[in-house]
């Protein structure tokens, strides 16, 4: 069991710098992790018997007897065992075609708050808020005084989101920040991006042997 306790509005306001939330469940022992830095760090310590090929889209695959053949734009792999880790795109490989689908999420991060701006919200320590609802808003306060917010989730082609589409969605993030921190300027968002997560009907993971 995780050590945890309920926090009410007053204590939440002190910890988060906003009175937006009425009640929360605090679990101890969590960490805020930068996924990009984690991946880069893992790449740096890969063992010698592991090769990494980036930007190598899988075009097709098939299995003949006990050999799995995978075709790429600039090469081919033949192997007896393989793990397909495709997030929400199992269907594009003809695997479990009716079991999962990709959801596109959009997030934004502010520039570092100035010392004066940070004082207006009580100079809280870094924190992270996860929603009760699966697709509710996720908010972070980082060590370098940035606010990260993800409050959109939609079925959208993740490879065809134009800059104008991203800017429209970042408006939701700007509104979300303003609701929680009305004393901060409106133009503090520095970057926005989108990504994909896999969803299933019963919210469970798909990890099993194909054949």
Predicted regions and their residues:
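Dinucleotide-binding Rossmann-like beta1-alpha1 core, especially the glycine-rich loop
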Residues: 1-8
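Active-site substrate-recognition segment that forms the wall
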Residues: 58-60, 75-116, 120-210
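A structural preference for short, hydrophobic beta-strand core positions in alpha/beta folds
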Residues: 6, 52-54, 189-191
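Broad structural signal for hydrophobic residues in well-ordered alpha-helices, predominantly aliphatic
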Residues: 12, 46, 177-178
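Alpha-helical structural context
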Residues: 15, 49, 180-181
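Flexible hinge/switch segments at interdomain interfaces of large molecular machines
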Residues: 11-19
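Helical element adjacent to the flavin cofactor pocket in flavoenzyme catalytic cores
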Residues: 19-81
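Conserved FAD-binding subdomain of flavin-dependent enzymes
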Residues: 1, 44, 119-120
């Amino acid at each position: 069991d995780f050590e945890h306790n309920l926090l009410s509005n007053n204590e939440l306001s002190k910890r988060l710098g906003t009175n937006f939330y009425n009640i929360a469940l605090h679990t101890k022992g969590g960490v805020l992790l930068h996924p990009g830095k984690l991946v880069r760090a893992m790449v740096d310590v890969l063992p010698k018997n592991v090769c990494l090929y980036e930007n190598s889209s899988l075009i097709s695959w098939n299995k003949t007897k006990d050999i799995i053949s995978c075709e790429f734009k600039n090469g081919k792999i033949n192997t007896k065992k393989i793990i397909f880790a495709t997030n929400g795109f199992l269907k594009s490989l003809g695997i479990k075609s009716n079991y999962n689908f990709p959801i596109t999420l959009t997030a934004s991060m502010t520039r570092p708050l100035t010392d004066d701006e940070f004082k207006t919200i009580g100079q809280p320590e870094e924190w992270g808020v996860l929603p009760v609802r699966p697709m509710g808003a996720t908010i972070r306060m980082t060590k370098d005084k940035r606010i990260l917010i993800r409050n959109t989730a939609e079925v959208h082609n993740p490879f065809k989101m134009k800059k104008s589409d991203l800017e429209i969605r970042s408006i939701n993030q700007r509104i979300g920040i303003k609701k929680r921190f009305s004393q901060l300027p409106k133009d503090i968002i520095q970057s926005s991006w989108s990504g994909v997560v896999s969803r299933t009907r019963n919210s469970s993971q798909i990890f099993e042997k194909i054949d």
